[in-house]
From Swiss-Prot:
This is DNA replication and repair protein RecF. The keyword Isomerase does not apply. Its main location: cytoplasm. Keywords: ATP-binding, Cytoplasm, DNA damage, DNA repair, DNA replication, DNA-binding, Nucleotide-binding, SOS response. One of its GO terms (molecular function) is single-stranded DNA binding. GO terms for biological process: DNA replication; DNA synthesis involved in DNA repair; double-strand break repair; SOS response. The keyword Ribosomal protein does not apply. The RecF protein is involved in DNA metabolism; it is required for DNA replication and normal SOS inducibility. RecF binds preferentially to single-stranded, linear DNA. It also seems to bind ATP. It is found in: Cytoplasm. The gene is recF.
Length: 375
């Protein structure tokens, strides 16, 4: 899979741009605040219909404009697929092969991306919410079923929390309706929990292999899924977990009404990364945390290939300068000759020459993208 063409209209600082890319390595060079990261972000948004930098679509639309449009041509082994995403105050409209999609869940997965950014260390060092978001976004690209289930779960969770607030304030008193919401939440919560566990078990295998290569077998990386469901019971079927969630909601009903919020479910779960059986977030060195984050991110590439049959596109947003030679080498080994890559940099000096041996180079200046001619 690769992106052969990208068109932007009224996207951030881009008035109008049409860029044709190499199926191999594409390097975007420019000073800060010229639009390099915006271009990478546009590819990410085209893939996932949301930004990794903001939750507000208005920020993606050029100042004084009513909409932004991103159009791309995806080349797969099965053929070409035109994609289009329009962002406006009315919401998002997504097209595949010029046909508007009724749901974004039908659109996501047409273009798969893996993004490396300076904030990736937050996967290890950040809050549980950061790790849940990471799982949901990455797994959502590979499984439309998971994307649907997590979307339904979040929607029902919002309704249930609102109703718990009403019960807390005595603006409502119908516990039968609360039971209906609890039943629905338990059903989707069980689906999400089982899928997350399976996804993380698969990712762990890839990440372990990469981590051992980087550390030359000195360290072993393992994942531990943390839930209110006891660990020994997490390997149950969806039906068994559904029944367990139902029981927990019944037991916690008085406490949840008192607090006005849902206390049980995968929206409170976490994943713990262990290096040699020690929590790397709490006890790992900066180097161990970086290696863990890199191993987890690199594992996405092979996992997506295994799940979808196609390699994803790799987006490297100003991260190579932060990696030492060893980590750059392992990054290079992972994507060389098999993954279309986009990388941003202010200078080529900090980038290993092997990575940019035959790139297509673009200069980005104030929202204008110019391809440099090969010598």
């Amino acid at each position: 899979m690769y992106l052969s063409e990208l068109q932007l209209n009224h996207y951030r600082n881009y008035e109008s741009v049409d860029v044709h890319f190499s199926p191999d390595t594409n390097v975007l060079i420019g000073e800060n605040a010229q639009g390099k990261t915006n271009l990478l972000e546009a590819i990410y948004v085209l893939a996932l219909a949301r930004s990794h930098r903001t939750n507000t679509d208005r920020e993606l639309i050029q100042w004084h404009e009513d909409f932004a449009k991103i159009t791309g041509l995806v080349q797969r082994s099965a053929g070409k697929t035109p994609l289009e995403l329009v962002l406006s105050q009315k919401g998002k409209k997504a097209k595949v092969n010029h046909l508007e999609q009724a749901k974004l869940s039908q659109y996501i997965g047409q273009l798969n991306v893996v993004l490396f950014a300076p904030e990736d260390l937050n996967i290890v060092k950040g809050s549980p919410a950061v790790r849940r978001h990471f799982i949901d976004m990455e797994f959502g690209q590979m499984s439309s079923k998971y994307l649907y289930n997590i979307s339904q779960y979040k929607s029902i969770l919002k309704q249930r929390n609102q109703y718990l607030k009403q019960l807390q304030r005595r603006q409502a008193k119908d516990l039968v309706y609360l039971g209906v919401l609890s039943d629905q939440l338990a059903a989707y919560g069980a689906e999400v929990t089982v899928a997350r566990r399976q996804f993380l078990q698969q990712m762990e295998k890839w990440a372990q292999k990469l981590h051992q290569e980087i550390t030359k077998d000195r360290e072993v990386l393992t994942f531990k899924y943390q839930s209110q469901i006891p660990e020994e019971q997490l390997d149950q079927s969806v039906e068994e977990l559904y029944q367990q969630f139902q029981t927990l909601y019944e037991k916690q009903q008085i406490r949840e009404v008192e607090q006005g919020t849902t206390l049980i479910g995968p929206h409170r779960d976490d994943v713990q990364f262990l290096v040699n059986d020690k929590d790397v977030q709490a006890f790992g060195s900066q180097g161990q945390q970086r290696t863990t984050a890199l191993s987890v991110k690199l594992a996405e590439i092979d996992l997506m290939k295994a799940q979808t049959g196609e390699y994803p596109i790799l987006l490297l947003d100003d991260v190579l300068s932060e990696l030492d030679d060893l980590r750059q080498t392992h990054l290079l080994k992972t994507f060389q000759n098999k993954v279309q890559t986009f990388l941003t940099t202010t200078s080529l000096e900090n980038v290993k020459k092997e990575i940019i041996a035959t790139p297509r180079v673009f200069t980005v200046t104030n929202g204008v993208v110019i391809e440099e001619q090969a010598e």
